[in-house]
Amino acid sequence: MSTIAESARIHPMAVVEDGATVGEGVKIGPFCHVGPHVVLQENVELLSHAIVTGRTVIGKGTRIFPMAVVGGDPQSVHHAGEETTLSVGANCTIREGVTMNTGTADFGGQTIVGDNNLFLANSHVAHDCRVGNHVIMSNNVMLAGHVVIEDRVILGGGSAVHQFTRVGRQAFVGGLSAVSYDVIPYGMLNGNPGLLSGLNVVGMTRAGIDRAVIHRVRRAYKAIFEGTASVRENAAAIREEYADCPEVVQILDFIAADSDRALSSPTRGQKG
C-alpha cells in the first residue's frame, strides 16, 4: 500500500504505484509516474510528465520538470537488476529531460545528489556519482559513472566528465569542455582536451573570499604547477607554508588524495 499524506495533491491523470510514499504538501501533475519504491518528501513538486522510479528518495522542496526521468536503472553492462538506489537532496531543481540513474551493486549501489542543486535541461547524472551541494549543471552536461562533483561547482553547457573523475569545490568548467582528469578546487578548466586556465577568481570573490586570500591561492597555484618537480611533489613542498590558509589546504589535500584519474594541469602533459 502507498503512504500518501492528506495534504498531497495528485492529479487524477498521474500514476502513483502501490508502495510509494508521498509526503505532506507534495504536488504531482498530470501524466507523471511515481514508482512503487519511491519516497517523495515534503513539498516535492512533479510537473507534468515527470517520472520518478527505482528505489529513489527525493528530498524536501525539490522540483522536477516535464520529461525528466529520475531513478532509472544504471546504464551499465554490469547491472543485473540488483536493488540499487538514488538519493536526491532538498531544494533541488531538476529541469526538462534530465536523467539520473541509480548506482551499481559492484560499487556500493548508491548514487547520491546533495541539496540546493540546479540541473538544467537534458543534463545527466550517471550511476554511482556523488554530487555535492549548490552545484549548477548547465544544459546537456554529462557525468559518466562514479564521478565526484564537490560543493559549488559550475559545469558549463555541453561539458562532459569522464568516469571516476573528481571536480573539486567551487571549480568552474567551461562550456563544451571535456573533463578527462581531476580538477582541483577553485580551478577553472576549458577546452577539449580540458586544460586548467587558472583559478575561478570570480566564483571565489562571489563566495566572499578575501582578496588577500585569493592572492595567496594564486601564489600556491603557481608553485604547484610551475615548479620543477611533479605536481604532487610541488604540493607537498608548500604544505607547511600554507598550513594557515584553508583554501590552499583544500587544494593540497585534493592533490594528495588517492584517485583513479590524473590531475588536470595547464599543459597537455600530466605531471600528477
Swiss-Prot record:
Its EC number is 2.3.1.129. Pfam families: Acetyltransf_11, Hexapep. Transmembrane segments: none annotated. InterPro entries: Acetyltransf_C, Acetyltransf_C_sf, Hexapep, Lipid_A_LpxA, Trimer_LpxA-like_sf. The keyword Ribonucleoprotein does not apply. Gene3D superfamilies: Hexapeptide repeat proteins (2.160.10.10), Udp N-acetylglucosamine O-acyltransferase, C-terminal domain (1.20.1180.10). Involved in the biosynthesis of lipid A, a phosphorylated glycolipid that anchors the lipopolysaccharide to the outer membrane of the cell. Belongs to the transferase hexapeptide repeat family. LpxA subfamily. This is Acyl-[acyl-carrier-protein]--UDP-N-acetylglucosamine O-acyltransferase. It comes from Rhizobium etli (strain CIAT 652).
